[in-house]
Regions:
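Extracytoplasmic/periplasmic substrate-recognition and gating elements
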Residues: 355-419
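A structural signal for short loop-to-beta-strand junctions that line the ligand-binding cleft
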Residues: 102, 154-156, 163-164, 193-230, ...
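Extracytoplasmic "Venus flytrap"/periplasmic binding protein-like
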Residues: 129-197, 210, 232-233, 238, ...
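C-terminal motif of bacterial Sec signal peptides marking the signal peptidase cleavage site
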Residues: 22-25
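Hinge/lid segment of periplasmic solute-binding proteins
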Residues: 77-107, 169-222, 251, 366
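Conserved C-terminal helix/tail region of periplasmic/extracytoplasmic solute-binding proteins
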Residues: 51-92, 390, 395, 409-495
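Extracytoplasmic/periplasmic solute-binding protein
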Residues: 206-221, 231, 246-301
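Glycine-centered hinge/linker elements that transmit conformational signals in sensory
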Residues: 254-257, 294-328
Length: 495
């Protein structure tokens, strides 16, 4: 079965999960029309309380816009549609840190944000309340759906009237950055701030400039396994028998996947496969591979044929050859015992489907195995992010909203506040959180911008992975055919 089914599941999944969504370079291509949305509606509101987060989305079409002068004075107070504003509240906070003092000058200003629904998400409301009380700001909200925002953000930037905050995913970030839709925010974010140091700012740092802040919590991929099923079939527990004994690598992982692949009495009909995932790139990333990487000259280069990447592709090929890779819907398959293990992020693997409660079987969690080309564990991550659009009227306000949103996510990872604690436990249990926290003390985060190349997500990506998963071609053959395609996509993206 082609992996597009997994992709569609992923898109539906992202749009339903409640997560807070959410580099100067040359621009190429024609400029988009200098027009804003005629159908968007803005409304100002005063927020009193909130307790959750917003959704995220994916978009693939290339977006280009010319660099235009900052029009903060010319467009002050302008927006799309009907506008009202919030009331400024008296601050009960003391601004003690360097970062907070940098935001102190925001008092009395208005921050323009967009919402995908008629009202801001609960997560946005919580951040808005904090900022109203802390910095004395006002908010202007504009209804702008995720898909609509991705097609119109470039237009609004070119017209000089974008919102102060935008969101992108790994599928969009690189193109937004090189199209000059996102602007550097180094002047607004203090990198050595206590919370900023935990925000993985390197993800959206390109050419030593910060263009965005990762959003959402629990961004890492883990291996979930059906502990009940493992016990029934006498399989070794990967956490206690491999990871804790420092014997968790690509060889032991492959052997476990093979032994966790079982057949019916006829010896031919598959009962369940060892592992399933939609994101085959994690096999490269757990070995430090990223497919493309900075070239040290302001651009990127294709490294899909380097040892770290090739070892990841080989592991995928070996799983396919052993019939140990489940290629159906691995989320449903995990619940229905069709794949004994699932590789995903906590909110997507567990929280989205309420599997801690819906599955009768006990669920185990273990970090991904250590790759053969690295000396320590590498943890694959993917995350959406917030950015400040070029020509935003209040870039400092946008950066403040981004910072406070990411800070709120970090706080909620270990909060004891009842509502947020309940939500966290729906995504990751206390037991699994303890495993995660200990693991992250030494694991190296790995992320890739390969997914953000023009034309990659919408078609070329599936062609690459299907050559291994469906056609069962060896990695060397696949790389020979795909390297040129990656180079072309890279050129279209960054020039």
């Amino acid at each position: 079965m082609k992996i597009m089914k997994n992709f569609l599941q992923y898109v539906a999944l992202l749009s339903a999960v409640a997560l807070i969504a959410g580099l100067t370079a040359c621009s190429s291509g024609s400029n988009p029309p200098s027009a804003s949305s005629d159908n968007s509606v803005s409304t100002g509101i005063t927020i009193e309380s909130a307790d959750a987060t917003s959704d995220a989305s994916l978009e693939e079409e290339p977006l280009k816009t010319a660099v235009t002068p900052n029009t903060s004075e010319a467009t002050q107070g302008q927006s799309v549609g009907k506008n009202t504003t919030t009331k400024t509240k008296t601050s009960a906070y003391t601004l003690d840190t360097v970062q907070e003092k940098k935001f102190a000058s925001l008092k009395g200003t208005t921050i323009h944000i967009t919402t995908s629904g008629k009202q801001p998400s609960d997560g946005q409301k919580k951040v808005m309340t904090t900022m109203q009380n802390k910095y004395g700001v006002k908010f202007e909200t504009q209804i702008l759906g995720w898909e609509e925002s991705q097609t119109k953000m470039g237009q609004m930037v070119a017209a000089g009237n974008p919102p102060d905050i935008g969101s992108f995913s790994e599928v969009l970030a690189l193109r937004y950055i090189y199209a000059n839709i996102a602007q550097p925010i180094d002047d607004y974010i203090v990198r050595d701030d206590e919370y900023a140091k935990q925000m993985r700012l390197e993800v959206y740092t390109i050419n030593d400039k910060l263009y965005g802040v990762p959003a959402g919590y629990f961004q890492e991929y883990y291996l979930y396994y059906n502990k009940t099923l493992f016990k029934e079939y006498g399989l070794k527990d990967p956490y206690t028998e491999y990871y804790l004994k420092d014997n968790w690598n690509y060889n032991t992982f492959l052997a476990l996947c093979k032994s966790a692949t079982k057949y019916e009495a006829d010896g031919k009909t598959l009962k369940f496969a060892g592992v399933g995932t939609w994101n085959y790139a994690v096999f490269m990333m757990a070995n430090g591979g990223t497919g493309i990487c900075p070239d040290g000259k302001g651009g990127f280069e294709v490294v899909i044929d380097k040892p770290a990447e090739m070892a990841g592709l080989q592991l995928l090929y070996d799983l396919v050859e052993a019939n140990a890779l489940y290629t159906g819907d691995s989320y449903t398959g995990f619940r229905q015992r069709k794949n004994a293990m699932l590789i995903e992020r906590p909110a997507h693997a567990i929280g989205q489907f309420d599997y801690y409660n819906r599955m009768d079987d006990e669920i185990g969690m273990v970090p991904l195995p250590k790759g053969p080309n690295v000396s320590q564990y590498h943890v694959p991550i993917t995350c959406d992010g917030y950015f400040v659009p070029r020509n935003a009227n209040n870039p400092l306000g946008g950066a403040a909203f981004i910072y406070e949103s990411a800070k709120q996510n970090l706080i909620e990872e270990h909060t004891t506040e009842p509502a947020a604690l309940k939500k966290r436990r729906e995504n990751i249990s206390d037991e699994h959180l303890a495993i995660r926290d200990e693991y992250l003390k030494s694991a190296v985060p790995v992320y890739t911008h390969m997914e953000g190349l023009a034309g990659w997500w919408s078609g070329e990506r599936d062609k690459m992975w299907n050559q291994i998963v469906v056609d069962k071609k060896k990695p060397a053959e696949v790389v020979d055919s795909i390297k040129g395609i990656l180079k072309s996509a890279l050129k279209r993206t960054i020039g």
